[in-house]
């Protein structure tokens, strides 16, 4: 798998270069990404409910951060979170990009510091992510349009057996039943 070199960035020791392995893009990336952009545009109106889902995911895992994001093109857009930042992040550095690459099972990294795919990843190297668990959010067409994930700065070796099932159930609750959309003016 090819590695990725991030541009020079400031570290506590001066300037550095990050080398790590980004997730591959799915074969259906073009249609998946377009669907994710539409989903994000539509779901943003339901921010209070998304925040409650993030809060619940954070509580289930007893972690520092939980969030709901859309992965569109080369960006991860964190739409709702509990305990952290919202905004845009480079897809190449986002662990959630692995969820959209392999969407049919929960993606869990108990110790990101020991996983060679993430050696050099700035979120891991800077101590922001030691543990990660994420589940895909699907649209009505079955495309992985978003991610519900939880992170913690320290690795978590012991995870409740049903925690990933609960995270999956919460991810399914993010996108409500599809309602007919009104036509978009051209």
Outline where the language-model segments fall:
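Residue-level signal for well-ordered alpha-helical scaffold segments within enzymatic catalytic domains
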Residues: 98-102, 140, 169
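Regulatory sensory and allosteric helical modules in signal-transduction proteins
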Residues: 71, 75-77, 86-130
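A cytosolic small-molecule/anion-sensing beta-strand core signal
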Residues: 72, 139, 146
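Short beta-strand-to-loop transition segments that serve as allosteric relay/switch motifs
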Residues: 148-157
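Flexible loop/coil segments at beta-strand boundaries within sensory signal-transduction domains
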Residues: 138-143, 153
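A short, aliphatic-rich beta-strand micro-motif
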Residues: 130-139
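Intrinsically disordered, low-complexity terminal regulatory regions
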Residues: 2-94, 162, 166-186
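Short hydrophobic/aromatic beta-strand element in the GNAT-like acyltransferase core
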Residues: 65, 134, 147
């Amino acid at each position: 798998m090819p590695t990725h070199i991030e541009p020079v960035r400031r570290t506590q020791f001066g300037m550095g270069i990050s080398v790590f392995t980004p997730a591959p893009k799915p074969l259906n990336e073009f249609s998946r990404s377009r669907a994710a952009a539409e989903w994000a545009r539509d779901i943003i109106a339901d921010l209070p409910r998304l925040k409650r889902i993030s809060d619940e995911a954070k509580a289930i895992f007893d972690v520092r951060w939980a969030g709901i994001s859309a992965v569109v093109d080369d960006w991860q857009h964190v739409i709702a979170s509990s305990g952290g930042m919202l905004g845009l992040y480079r897809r190449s550095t986002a662990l959630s990009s692995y969820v959209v690459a392999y969407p049919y099972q929960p993606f869990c990294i108990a110790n990101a510091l020991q996983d060679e795919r993430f050696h050099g990843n700035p979120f891991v190297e800077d101590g922001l992510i030691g543990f990660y668990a994420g589940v895909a959010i699907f649209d009505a067409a079955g495309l992985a349009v978003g991610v519900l994930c939880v992170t913690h700065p320290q690795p978590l070796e012991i995870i409740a057996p049903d925690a990933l099932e609960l995270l999956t159930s919460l991810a399914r609750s993010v996108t409500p039943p599809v309602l007919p959309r009104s036509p978009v003016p051209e």
